């Protein structure tokens, strides 16, 4: 059962029990989908709000997945396959993924999380403004801009992020008439 992934002691949803120190927006996607398709929650507001309260935010955006204490993973504590690792703030090592982040915030909004609308608006703005030479959507945004090579070449179109339009409709922040 989905609710069983909430750890009361830690105060957040556990995405993978093998790595309980890992917090990710992915754990909130089923909650978002339930609001989208059925207009009702699966989780309690406490579960959603406490999970979102653990999410770090810097310059208007947050990492997709992060270590509960250190934000970034190390080779010793990573929740990835043995041969996979990325530098701090890159890709799955605390990179920021707009679609998952916004869907998580929408779940929070539906549960009355006070920071939701601001976080959604900030994240949308950061997607376009963080890299002035690339004012378009990216697969992910690096969370540590000091890392050499943190900006991967972009395809200039990242269609998964179009899903954010649907998420904004679920949030009541846009209407299909705006298309």
Model-derived segments and spans:
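Internal, well-ordered domain-core segments that constitute the primary functional module
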Residues: 1-5
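C-terminal capping/lid segments that line or modulate ligand- or cofactor-binding pockets
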Residues: 6-46, 84-86, 90-179
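Short, surface-exposed beta-strand/loop "edge" segments at domain boundaries and coil↔beta transitions
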Residues: 20-21, 60, 74
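Carboxylate/His-rich catalytic cores and anion/metal-binding grooves
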Residues: 42-58
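Charge-rich, low-complexity amphipathic helices
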Residues: 56-57, 70-77, 126-130
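Active-site rim segments in enzyme catalytic domains, especially the processed small/beta chain
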Residues: 58-64
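Generic long, charged, amphipathic alpha-helical segments
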Residues: 64-89, 93-97
């Amino acid at each position: 059962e989905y609710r069983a992934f909430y750890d009361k002691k830690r105060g957040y949803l556990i995405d993978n029990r093998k790595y309980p120190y890992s917090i990710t927006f992915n754990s909130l996607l089923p909650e978002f989908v339930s609001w989208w398709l059925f207009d009702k929650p699966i989780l309690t507001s406490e579960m959603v709000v406490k999970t979102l309260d653990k999410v770090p935010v810097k310059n208007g955006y947050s990492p997709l997945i992060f270590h509960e204490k250190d934000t970034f993973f190390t080779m010793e504590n990573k929740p990835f396959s043995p041969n996979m690792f990325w530098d701090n703030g890159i890709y799955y090592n605390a990179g920021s993924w707009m679609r998952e982040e916004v869907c998580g915030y929408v779940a929070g909004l539906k549960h009355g999380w006070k920071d939701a609308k601001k976080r959604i608006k900030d994240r949308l703005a950061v997607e376009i403004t963080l890299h002035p030479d690339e004012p378009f959507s990216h697969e992910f945004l690096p969370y540590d801009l000091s890392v050499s090579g943190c900006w991967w070449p972009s395809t200039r179109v990242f269609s998964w992020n179009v899903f954010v339009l649907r998420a904004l409709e679920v949030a009541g922040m846009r209407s299909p008439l705006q298309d």
